[in-house]
From Swiss-Prot:
TM region(s), chain numbering: none
Keywords on record: ATP synthesis, CF(1), Hydrogen ion transport, Ion transport, Membrane, Mitochondrion, Mitochondrion inner membrane, Transit peptide, Transport
Gene: ATP16
Pfam families per record: ATP-synt_DE_N, ATPD_C_fung
Protein name: ATP synthase subunit delta, mitochondrial
Main location: mitochondrion
Role: Mitochondrial membrane ATP synthase (F(1)F(0) ATP synthase or Complex V) produces ATP from ADP in the presence of a proton gradient across the membrane which is generated by electron transport complexes of the respiratory chain. F-type ATPases consist of two structural domains, F(1) - containing the extramembraneous catalytic core, and F(0) - containing the membrane proton channel, linked together by a central stalk and a peripheral stalk. During catalysis, ATP turnover in the catalytic domain of F(1) is coupled via a rotary mechanism of the central stalk subunits to proton translocation.
Molecular function (Gene Ontology), one example: proton-transporting ATP synthase activity, rotational mechanism
Length: 159
């Protein structure tokens, strides 16, 4: 009888603890963002509140005092929150590195403001890429598969 009662009490207390901790608390200070492309620097040590990243391991929200980490970026939206404003950039991939001094460095081959894309153009490019995936030429099929992955992520971001 005691074991059954103790097991019920333990299970309830464990569930309560897990339910309380679901997201990070805002940290003191600001995150310093460096966002660089080969031809342009979008942010250079700019203090921001939070950055949301499309990482290979899943969506990640980075705040000041985040644990140091290196993440591979997948095609998706990088959202930069500065106070009450938000800027969204579509990246085709890249890397993000969080340093112990609350500096986030994002490097990507290309990044464009999300509002610069036309949903109609994305749909037509997506249809073309889907046709090319079944190409007999292996190189063309591989390139089309990569293009398809990027365009599907872009189409999802525009919805």
């Amino acid at each position: 009888m005691f074991r059954l009662s103790a097991a019920r009490t333990l299970a309830k207390s464990v569930n309560t603890v897990v339910a309380k901790r679901t997201y990070a608390e805002a940290a003191d200070g600001a995150l310093k963002l460096q966002f660089a492309l080969p031809h342009q620097t979008l942010f250079s040590g700019t203090p921001v509140t939070q950055v949301n990243l499309p990482a290979k391991s899943g969506q990640i929200g980075i705040l000041a005092n985040h644990v140091p980490t290196v993440e591979q970026l997948v095609p998706g939206v990088v959202e930069v929150l500065e106070g009450s404003s938000s800027k969204k950039f579509f990246v085709s991939g890249g890397f993000a590195t969080v340093q112990p001094d609350s500096t986030l460095a994002i490097t990507s081959v290309e990044a464009f403001p999300l509002e610069s894309f036309s949903p109609e153009n994305v749909r037509s490019l997506l249809a073309e890429a889907q046709k090319n995936v079944s190409s007999a030429d292996e190189v063309a099929a591989a390139e089309a598969a990569i293009q398809l992955e990027v365009l599907e992520a872009l189409q999802a971001a525009l919805k």
